[in-house]
């Protein structure tokens, strides 16, 4: 019996007319079904290095408003098999701009993530299905994860 975790391979990144498409192949070499987060939970982009990091995991994710917690979409990959996951992202993102001094008005900055030259993907996974715990003081969703699969790809500028 093998008890390996989820394995990820970033197959392709390409810019479409209205989106950035990222295709990830996930594999399961274990003897039981694995469950994984199947949607992007956070996008980190560094315009200076053109590094894009997609997190399909809630580990380390800082929520501004606890009520904003939305449960992710989950998928499964059967024992000794593979599956493909297609992620469709906007070509640009808008985020709060860092400010040297406090200001009552927030500033925003737009970044074109389709210009990324390095793409990394993290996928949270578990050996057990996720069930929401409605009890008070329940474990946070990221406690469900047994591990995180990582994949990266260097993208050649066109």
How would you name each of these model-derived features?
Residues 1-14:
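N-terminal edge beta-strand
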Residues 11-13, 39, 43, 50-52, ...:
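Generic beta-strand hydrophobic packing signal
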Residues 16-17, 79:
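Surface-exposed loops/turns
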Residues 18-22:
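Structural beta-strand segments of beta-rich domains
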């Amino acid at each position: 019996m093998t008890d390996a975790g989820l394995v990820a391979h970033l197959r392709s990144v390409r810019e479409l007319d209205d989106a950035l498409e990222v295709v990830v192949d996930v594999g399961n070499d274990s003897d039981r079904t694995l469950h994984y987060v199947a949607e992007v939970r956070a996008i980190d982009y560094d315009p200076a290095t053109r590094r894009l990091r997609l997190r399909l995991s809630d580990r380390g994710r800082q929520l501004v408003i606890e009520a904003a917690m939305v449960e992710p979409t989950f998928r499964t990959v059967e024992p000794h098999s593979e599956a493909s996951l297609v992620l469709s992202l906007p070509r640009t993102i808008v985020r709060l701009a860092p400010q040297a001094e406090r200001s009552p008005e927030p500033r925003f900055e737009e970044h074109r993530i389709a210009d990324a030259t390095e793409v990394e993907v993290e996928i949270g996974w578990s050996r057990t299905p996720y069930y929401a715990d409605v009890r008070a003081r329940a474990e946070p969703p990221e406690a469900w994860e047994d591990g995180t699969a990582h994949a990266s790809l260097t993208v050649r500028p066109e």
